[in-house]
């Protein structure tokens, strides 16, 4: 009986299974966007902006409509459009992290590299395409940033992301700052 059981076990096949995650993007085919960081790295569609480390003493004020905050980091969004596109309108949103003042709240629910989240710190995004900084208000569909394309099918938005106090009357504590936003560009 033992010999029969060993024969049956040795004849059995072992199996392992797993999961493969696939990610992609389907665009309407009219405009392709790129996120360009300060190093000139360009990523189609999605991207990341890494701000320099700020000291607590650097983050002195709450958001201001026409003044970026501490350690402002440049980035751009380029749009390469086909056809007779005349203008672009950009809005930004963040279902999870938009603050009432139009900035992005820090994600305090994660630990990064063993570091807890900084408190009382938000990220402000200012559109500097025209030369004058203007706050991009998260989750405000009426705050469209218009870019007119002059005889070309390409356009570039220029931005600065910076640290600001979430509440000007509260102290900032150290830690990581992590957040995200979605951008939408409509065109005509």
Regions found by a protein language model. Give the residues of each.
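Mature extracellular/passenger domains of Gram-negative fimbrial/pilin and adhesin proteins
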Residues: 14-188
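N-terminal signal peptide c-region/cleavage motif recognized by signal peptidases
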Residues: 10-12
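Residues within alpha-helical transmembrane segments of multi-pass membrane proteins, especially transporters
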Residues: 5-7
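Sec-dependent signal peptide recognition
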Residues: 1-3
């Amino acid at each position: 009986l033992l010999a029969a059981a060993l024969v049956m076990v040795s004849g059995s096949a072992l199996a392992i299974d797993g999961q493969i995650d696939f990610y992609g993007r389907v665009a309407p085919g009219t405009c392709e966007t790129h996120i360009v960081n300060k190093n000139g790295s360009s990523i189609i569609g999605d991207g990341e902006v890494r701000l320099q480390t700020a000291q607590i003493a650097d983050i002195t004020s709450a958001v201001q409509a026409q003044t970026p905050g501490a350690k402002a980091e440049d980035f751009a969004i380029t749009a390469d459009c086909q056809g007779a596109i005349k203008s672009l309108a950009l809005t930004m949103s963040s279902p999870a992290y938009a603050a009432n003042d139009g900035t992005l709240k820090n994600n305090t629910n994660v630990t990064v590299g063993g570091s807890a989240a900084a408190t009382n710190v938000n990220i402000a995004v200012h559109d500097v395409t025209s030369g004058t900084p203007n706050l991009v208000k998260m989750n405000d569909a009426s705050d469209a940033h218009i870019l007119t394309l002059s005889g070309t099918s390409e356009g570039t938005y220029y931005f600065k992301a910076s640290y600001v106090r979430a509440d000007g009357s509260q102290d900032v504590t150290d830690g990581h700052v992590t957040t995200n936003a979605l951008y939408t560009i409509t065109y005509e």
